[in-house]
A protein has these predicted regions:
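Short S/T/G/P-rich N-terminal loop/turn motif that feeds into the first structured element of a domain
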Residues: 1-71, 79-87
Length: 87
């Protein structure tokens, strides 16, 4: 299992983004993704960090591709995403 740390910017409030993110928890879990943390940067509420445990990289990548429209709708600015994976 890997731990993935993602940071990115959002185009709306953290509360709006978080509500959207949380509404997809069941399908994230079905894709082998277990969110551990989500929060805004202390000095910039439009910069977000999420930490997720991933059981299968291929399933996680497929989830991101399949749900790209939903991710964009949440306010996530995809081109600002930085991803780091840890063993």
């Amino acid at each position: 299992m890997k731990t993935q740390v993602m940071t990115f910017r959002i185009s709306n409030s953290f509360e709006e983004w978080a509500k959207h993110f949380d509404s997809h928890l069941e399908i994230q879990k079905a894709a082998g993704m277990m969110p551990l943390f989500r929060g805004p940067h202390e000095d910039d509420p439009q910069k977000v960090c999420i930490v997720i445990q991933i059981s299968d990289d291929a399933k996680a990548d497929a989830f991101m591709q399949e749900h790209e429209a939903d991710i964009l709708e949440s306010g996530h600015i995809l081109e600002t995403t930085e991803v780091n994976k840890y063993l």
